[in-house]
């Protein structure tokens, strides 16, 4: 997940639990695979062992080549058709498919990224970050959850249809698309793949990372886990604020210098409250949960634009970041730049880099106007230095229903709702092409698991991998029927 997504994914898990605690006070053939657990003896599945090896290959953004070539070779040995989209240093992107892409078949595309973020101080890890340690029924290491675990789930699910595809002419292709550079904005990965994606892949749907499951939420009265399938996400752009001053450079006589103007401006901007916005995506998410909940409380929630519910949201959103993420744009200070040359010399130019996340329907121009209004500074220069695709939405349709069916089949009593992902992923490059795109990590996750993403002690449970494979196998099988 890109940049600040680890925090945002944690917000996803906490969002509904916080919201409700405040509001309520409260028949084609395919290869069968053995379950990971038999009786009292734990059996480590082939998929888990595969993931352990994959995690042990470091693939920090820009250094994905070794991991990419290993993964492509493994997919080839499993009988998948390999096609490199790009094959350059720091930019390897390949497809592993049931049929060659040249077949032109309509295509179900599973998307994952091979790059990971830096591990940080390895001494702070419970286990080394690049050894793929299997312990406590978990695979530990950088990328085990984000995003190598999902890749293994996708590959092992699609592999189970290789023999069938060789015997019969299936009505569609299934592809696992493995890309580079997601953690740094996708410019070496999905941005390149998307250029001729429709012509080369003939996609019916793209399924990438996104929502996941939360277990036994009290407001659903113990009926089972709640899964969110993301249908939209926030857009991303980097904004640069620059201040210049021609005051004397010596620190002992400086007046209203650039550093002071920057500090005062950033204080005002970063403490300015963003307006609460009920997007149609958030409205659909809240109303879907309300329908699942039922009763008087569910009826209130099923109308999230009502004065009663909006009053509640405005009262609590500012105090609860996990709720605020869904309902507001976000500006985060991500870096500072200075022309300062010595400690007794005042810099005449200072700059701040802002990581900005936009709700669907919001525009870069609108956010720039918000920045100007908050700063009230005629001397600041504002420029957009990087901008991803504008946030678009996939309306839930046939493939959403199949994913929901697969989750409900695997997890007893599960409820599935569409959701807005308060983060940015590579999914946005493909939504921008007008293709149905959904985000799903097909597993139940815990707060400690999500908090470890992009941090220390990242892990994925063995059972997450095995059950996730079953979900996607069920999805593909249902599509064939």
Role assignments for model-derived ranges:
Residues 13-22:
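Bacterial N-terminal signal peptides
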Residues 21-38, 214:
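Bacterial Sec-dependent signal peptides at the C-terminal "C-region" and cleavage site
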Residues 103-105, 214-216, 224, 275-340, ...:
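An extended, acidic, His-containing surface patch that forms the Zn2+-binding/catalytic region
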């Amino acid at each position: 997940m890109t940049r600040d997504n680890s925090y945002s994914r944690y917000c996803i898990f906490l969002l509904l639990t916080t919201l409700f605690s405040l509001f309520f006070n409260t028949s084609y053939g395919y290869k069968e695979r053995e379950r990971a657990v038999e009786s009292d003896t734990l059996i480590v599945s082939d998929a888990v062992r595969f993931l352990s090896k994959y995690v042990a290959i470091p693939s920090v953004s820009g250094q994905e080549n070794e991991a990419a070539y290993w993964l492509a070779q493994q997919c080839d040995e499993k009988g998948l058709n390999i096609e490199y989209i790009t094959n350059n240093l720091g930019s390897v992107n390949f497809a592993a498919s049931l049929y060659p892409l040249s077949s032109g078949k309509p295509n179900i595309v599973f998307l994952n990224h091979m790059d990971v973020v830096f591990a940080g101080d390895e001494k702070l890890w419970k286990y080394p970050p690049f050894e793929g340690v299997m312990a406590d029924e978990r695979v530990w290491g950088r990328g085990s959850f984000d995003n190598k675990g999902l890749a293994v789930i996708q590959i092992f699910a699609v592999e189970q249809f290789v023999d069938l595809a060789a015997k019969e002419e299936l009505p569609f292709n299934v592809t696992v698309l493995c890309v580079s550079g997601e953690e740094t904005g996708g410019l070496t990965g999905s941005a390149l793949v998307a250029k001729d994606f429709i012509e080369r892949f003939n996609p019916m749907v793209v399924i990438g990372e996104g929502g996941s499951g939360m277990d036994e939420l009290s407001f659903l009265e113990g009926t089972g886990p709640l899964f969110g399938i993301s249908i939209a996400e926030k857009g991303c752009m980097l904004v640069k604020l620059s201040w210049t001053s021609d005051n004397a450079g010596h620190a002992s006589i400086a007046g209203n210098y650039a550093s002071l103007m920057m500090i005062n401006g950033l204080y005002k901007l970063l403490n300015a409250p963003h307006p609460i916005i009920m997007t149609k995506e958030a409205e659909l998410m809240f109303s879907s949960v309300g329908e699942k909940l039922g009763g008087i409380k569910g009826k209130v929630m099923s109308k999230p634009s009502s004065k009663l519910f909006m009053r509640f949201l405005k009262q609590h959103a500012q105090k609860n970041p996990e709720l605020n993420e869904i309902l507001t744009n976000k500006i985060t200070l991500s870096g500072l730049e200075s022309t300062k040359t010595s400690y007794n010399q005042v810099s005449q130019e200072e700059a701040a880099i802002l990581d900005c996340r936009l709700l669907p329907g919001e525009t870069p121009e609108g956010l720039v106007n918000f920045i100007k209004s908050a700063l009230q500074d005629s001397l600041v220069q504002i420029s957009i230095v990087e901008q991803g695709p504008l946030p678009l939405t996939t309306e839930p349709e046939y493939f959403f229903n199949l994913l929901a069916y697969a989750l409900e089949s695997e997890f007893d009593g599960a409820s599935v709702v569409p959701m807005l992902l308060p983060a940015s992923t590579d999914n946005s490059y493909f939504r921008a092409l007008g293709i149905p795109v959904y985000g799903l990590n097909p597993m139940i996750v815990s707060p400690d698991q999500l908090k470890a993403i992009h941090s220390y002690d990242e892990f994925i449970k063995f059972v997450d991998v095995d059950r996730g494979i079953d979900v996607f196998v069920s999805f593909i099988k249902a599509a064939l029927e």
